[in-house]
Structure formats: C-alpha cells, structure tokens
A protein has these predicted regions:
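An acidic, phosphate/nucleotide-engaging active-site surface
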Residues: 95-159
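Histidine-anchored nucleotide/phosphate-binding helix
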Residues: 59-78
Length: 430
C-alpha cells in the first residue's frame, strides 16, 4: 500500500562500510589482558572481589564479565558481581539485578553471585564539596573491578566521558549518589564531577582497576584493556579519543526527517544517542561534526528498555503504541535523577506511522513536502544500513564508504497504517 496523502521522496537502501575491528575470541582477549596486568597479579588469594557491570547494551558483556570472574577464580579469589547503576532498573535492587539478568549475567551463568543493593556509604568529599557515596557491597569487598565500555557521552564533551571513571563515580554512587552528582553537574559540569568523585573513590584504595571495552562502528568488541588505577585517567583519555575516531553517523549532512524504528536504554543511556540524532537538553543540532536534523519520528520503544522511555522527549512525534509501553515511574525517575526533565516528556503522538508522517512532514520547513529529505534507521546505535531519500543520493554516490544496495521504493504501510519494516528487529547486545 503506497503513501497516498502526499507525494514524498522514494527511499533507497544503503550500506555504510565501516572498518571491522572485531576480536576473534573475546574471552581469550580478556584473559590475556588480565594475566598481563601487573596490578591483577598482586591481589592475594582469598580476596573478595566485587566485579561491576552496568546497564548499557554492551556487546558480549556476559562473555566479558564471565571471563573476568573466571580470572579471579583462577587466582583463588572470591569474585561476586554488583550492578553498577544509578537510577536504572527503576532505582531498585531487584530491578537492577533484573537488568543484568536480561543481559545474561546471573549466578547460574556467571558462576558467581550477583549481589544487588542500593545501600551506600559516604567515603569522603571532593575539593568542590561533593559528598561521595559508594556502593556498600563494593566498599566492604577487598577490591573492586569495573567492566565498562569507553565511548562518548550523550550530554557533554570532554577528555573523560562514558567509561570506567563515569561508572566509578555515578554507578558506584547508586541512586543516592547519582541524584547528587547530576545536581552538581549543573554547576561545575559532568566531567568535573566525574574527575572529582572518581578521585575520592580512588583514594579509598578499594579500586583495583577496570576493564575498558571498545566497540567498533558495527558494535563488535574491538579491544579490551585492563587499566590499573595508577594510569587509569591517562589511558582512558587515550581510549576515548580512539573510539571517537571510529564513530558512525547518519549518512547525510542535513536531514529534514529522521525516522527511528526504536528508542531505548539498550541503545543509549539517553534512549537515543544524542550525538547521532543531534539533540541535547539545550535544543536541536548542538553537536558539531554531526548531521543537522530538523525533525525526529520514533516509531516504537525497545522491549529491552523495559518501559523506560527516557529520551523520547528528543523526538518531535511518536506513536500511540510507543506511549502505551511507557513505564512513567522508571522514565521519570531516570529524568529526575539526571536533573533533566525534557528528555522524559512525551511528544505529540498519533495512532499509526502514516498519520505521524502526514502530520510532521509539513513542519520540516519545505513548502513542497516532496522535497523533504528523509533517513530511516533502526535505532541510533545500528547505522550500518539505512533507507535514504533519493534526493540525498547525489552526495552519497562518490563516498567510498557508502554502498547503494537497493532500488528506489515508496514507503509502504500495512492495513493498520504502520510502515512495513525495512530492518530486522534489533537483537539484544550481549
């Protein structure tokens, strides 16, 4: 069934041929890095080691955590796993353990208990006056090791963004600490909070190190690094710069309408990677080196977000079916904890995809909507394939990293008025 209400551009499937940097054997790579780390060899047998895992959809995270657990067991230590999260899992101990379980991390599969609690202890104060909280189970362990992906953050730019330091500061602070830190971030910036709080955590002498994970543009596990506390800041800064150089973008300089099949916490902490869709709490098109996007239509909420629709406020329009899936408690806790309310706001919504497109296209700034440029992607994380409007093709044909793999086709809708899917449903990132 073709699009009947107005004439719009036909779409063509393209593929972005990003370099593939996948590790051949992730578990073996983790083991090798841990065995080569001097700091890991100095931990005495019998030590209780808290292994921290977070809530992001990190590829192979279950394999990585299992390899870390197995390493510590081979050293005759006693590893246990803790969820290192702020408000995620609806800010409850059970919810956070459930998040890990859905990523394949539980006692049965890991061979180590998962100990989840929101209890914290105060471990000091930063020079700026920030009281620093630390997960009680982590503090009472003999040592702590965090498994974290290093990548750009969705809300700010700096030398340290998302990674081991952010997990150490925000995640180990649990809900109580996360609320406090995000409030401070409004005053001194999130990077300042991460560095200050991270420094206090390091001064507890509880941190053993961290396993830094880098993913390529295909979301393959590309590199793993065992970071000791003495060189952690410098090494993480180096790794962040490297992974930023691998970043994928929407394949256009300017887009009138960006369509996403799904948003969700499994794709980004902000639901949508704001440095892909070019949005921030300060408004649209803040980020440099990212395509300018006028309007965003989000079709659905990922099941792996468990009702948390944080970031839906970055969209201009969505469907009733997405709104019906929202767990407002989880969404609003997430927004309030991060001291940002607009990402949790619900945009205008309509019964089906066709109606949403009919309503939003005339707002894209073109007197003739048939001239609106359109890009359709599965989510803000999976950018290898996209559907792009014909008027974008001239700028793409000479790009050696882009391959045109389909013929022009009109948008098609089913009997309920929803787009006939162009992409396979996103798999869980394990």
């Amino acid at each position: 069934m073709g699009f009947s209400a107005m004439s719009i551009q036909r779409l063509v499937r393209i593929r972005q041929n990003f370099p593939v940097r996948a590790l051949a054997d992730v578990s073996a790579a983790v083991r090798a890095k841990m065995e080569a780390a001097d700091w890991a060899q100095r931990i005495p047998p019998g030590s209780r080691i808290a292994v921290g895992a977070g809530s992001r959809g990190i590829q192979n995270i279950d394999v990585i955590v299992k390899a870390v657990v197995d390493f510590w067991k081979s050293r005759d230590c006693k590893p246990f796993i803790i969820p290192v999260m702020g408000s995620h899992g609806a800010a409850s101990a059970e919810g956070q353990a459930d998040v890990l379980r859905h990523y394949g991390i539980d006692e049965e599969r890991m061979g180590a208990p998962v100990v989840s609690s929101l209890d914290v202890v105060n471990v000091g104060t930063t020079p700026e006056g920030i009281d620093v909280s630390m997960d009680r189970n982590a503090f009472e362990a003999d040592g702590v090791m965090l498994c974290s992906r290093v990548k750009w953050h969705t809300d700010f730019e700096g030398g340290l963004e998302s990674g081991v330091h952010k997990m150490m500061a925000i995640g180990l602070g649990k809900w109580e600490g996360a609320k406090r830190y995000h409030t401070w971030a409004l005053n001194i910036g999130m990077e300042g909070v991460i560095r200050g709080v991270g420094g206090v955590i390091l001064n507890t002498k509880k941190m053993l190190g961290g396993l830094a994970i880098l993913e390529d543009a295909w979301h393959n596990t590309a590199e793993v690094h065992a970071l000791g506390v003495d060189s952690m800041v410098l090494r993480e800064e180096e790794l962040l710069a490297r992974t930023k150089s691998w970043k994928a973008n929407v394949p256009a300089k300017e887009v009138d309408l960006l369509i996403l099949d799904e948003t969700g916490k499994n794709f980004s902490g902000a639901g949508m990677d704001t440095k892909v869709v070019n949005r921030s709490v300060d408004g649209p098109n803040r980020w440099t080196g990212v395509p300018a996007i006028r309007r965003i239509f989000v079709r659905d909420l990922s099941e792996l977000s468990y009702g948390n629709a944080i970031g839906i406020g970055f969209a201009d329009i969505t469907t009733d079916r997405l709104v019906d899936k929202i767990d407002y408690n989880a969404t609003w806790i997430n927004g309030l904890t991060s001291s940002t309310t607009s990402p949790g706001a619900t945009p205008m919504h309509f019964a089906d995809d066709r109606t949403c497109i009919e309503k939003i296209l005339p707002t894209c700034g073109k007197l003739d909507v048939s001239k609106c440029s359109i890009v359709w992607i599965p989510n803000s994380m999976d950018l290898a394939e996209a559907m792009v409007s014909e008027n974008l093709l001239p700028a793409l044909r000479d790009n050696p990293e882009i391959e045109i793999i389909g013929e022009p086709e009109e948008l098609s809708f089913d009997a309920d008025g929803n787009l006939v899917g162009a992409f396979e449903p996103a798999a869980a990132a394990h």
